[in-house]
Amino acid sequence: MPRPYEIVAPLTVYEVLRRMRRLHRQDVEHFLHRLVDRPALSGDFEAPADDGRIHQVKIVGGWIVSYWIDHAACEVRVTSLEFIE
């Protein structure tokens, strides 16, 4: 049985999630659950990051979720969660 993927994110991402309105938080959490189930799921576009990796970027409601997949560790690395202004 393959090892399940897990979400890994900096504390700042969890703080943003905690402060979100319930409906927005549910939308983002639903996307993250889908991503854990299907880590090959692509974002809306890709963007280079300072660490040299190409990050997937997904627009969820009014929020931008940036992430990359560490297949070796079975982790979804969420790097940022920002409101679109």
List PLM regions with ranges.
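Short, charged/polar low-complexity linear motifs in solvent-exposed/disordered segments
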Residues: 33-35, 83-84
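Arg/Lys-rich, positively charged N-terminal/basic patches that mediate binding to nucleic acids
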Residues: 1-33
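Basic/aromatic recognition patch in beta-strand/loop cores that engages polyanionic ligands
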Residues: 44-85
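Short proline/glycine- and basic residue-enriched helix-capping loop/turn segments at helix->loop/beta transitions
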Residues: 36-41
